[in-house]
């Protein structure tokens, strides 16, 4: 069994960082030595085991089984127990996610999200943190990000997910100022070209419900075919061509008039028996003529 080589001498230092949520922190020795790792289980306390930033503590130095030094038997100066209260050490929900200090939350932090204590500066506290969805930096969540809609601030964020509208990083599609126009995304270029096409305009980078070219029809692209006019880039409910012109393109025949490009429920001639000659392929069961059905036939059987 691996044993820890403990030193009989006790040292004094100050807490440089501690996270209640993670259960560990670091102590800077007063003699200027290297920072020491301290685990929550090594704290001698009458209450909740925690340390406060800048707090003076007394401890022993031990060599762990991993070959690294750490602080154990951490007490108040003089060997007394650290009297920690549950509400005093975690009154604001533990350490701030931005700067690591206690007493406030990340959304109220004045330290920002720079690389000094929690950012992507390669320090000991950057490795385990997730990346902000807005700017790509570490040390805070997207809801606390101060670069919410910038676009320019997150461009080099590395690791930020691309905006669904413009393909850039640093913001979400709902906050995008680039819109879904053709100048940035409509041409199919950029990193979003492999996405599904908008059902309205055929472009990529946005959904039909967010499309700004609702009735366009001239954008083309890979959209689905309109049931009314046979064109692409929009759906039948927003089509401005109620009756197809020319060779209406492969639609089913309307049950009311026999024409193509629309359904019976949308037919402009619904219920009128005078609309013969619709070009339909169905014949009236009563008179044998095309253009109407038996229920609308005016001929006496």
Swiss-Prot record:
Zinc finger (CCHC-type): 94-111, 130-147, 161-178, 196-213, 224-241, 252-269, 282-299
Domain called CSD: residue spans: 13-76
Localization per Swiss-Prot or TrEMBL: Nucleus; Cytoplasm
Tissue expression profile of the protein: Mostly expressed in shoot and root apices, and siliques, and, to a lower extent, in roots, cotyledons, stems, shoots, leaves, floral buds and flowers.
Knockout mutant characteristics: Sensitive to freezing.
Keywords: Acetylation, Chaperone, Cytoplasm, DNA-binding, Metal-binding, Nucleus, Repeat, RNA-binding, Zinc, Zinc-finger
Induction details: Accumulates during cold acclimation, especially in roots.
Record InterPro entries: CSD, CSD_CS, CSP_DNA-bd, NA-bd_OB-fold, Znf_CCHC, Znf_CCHC_sf
GO molecular function, one term: DNA binding
One Pfam family linked to the record: CSD
GO CC list: cytoplasm; mitochondrion; nucleus
Post-translational modification N-acetylalanine, affected residues: 2
UniProt xrefs under PROSITE patterns: CSD_1 (PS00352), CSD_2 (PS51857), ZF_CCHC (PS50158)
GO biological process: cold acclimation; response to cold; unidimensional cell growth
Family the UniProt entry places it in: Belongs to the cold shock protein (CSP) family.
Subunit and partners: Interacts with PTAC16, PABN1, PABN2 and PABN3.
Function as written in the Swiss-Prot or TrEMBL entry: Chaperone that binds to RNA, single- (ssDNA) and double-stranded (dsDNA) DNA, and unwinds nucleic acid duplex. Promotes freezing tolerance.
Protein name, per record: Cold shock domain-containing protein 3
Lineage: Eukaryota, Viridiplantae, Streptophyta, Embryophyta, Tracheophyta
Record gene name: CSP3
